[in-house]
């Protein structure tokens, strides 16, 4: 199984825009994660796009490896934007594993 795409979806709500992430695989299994970060939706979506470039074509079941590779590759480690994006993608990968 390989990751084929990662898409973001923004749901506009009062005072907070919710950001959801959906990871797609070549076997038709998808996973969903949530990455809301108040007033930083565009930065968050940009961070998810960078993660998409890394994960496309990779095995979605190697969750911990991908988490550490992405975290260590980031210049600003531990920041709110990166950690929210990474958390959402990680949730989606665990969702895929569970399915």
Specify the residue positions occupied by each region the protein language model found:
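Structured beta-strand/loop patches that form or line metal/cofactor-binding pockets in enzymes
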Residues: 1-32, 36-37
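Metal- or metallocofactor-binding catalytic centers and their adjacent structured scaffolds
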Residues: 26-99
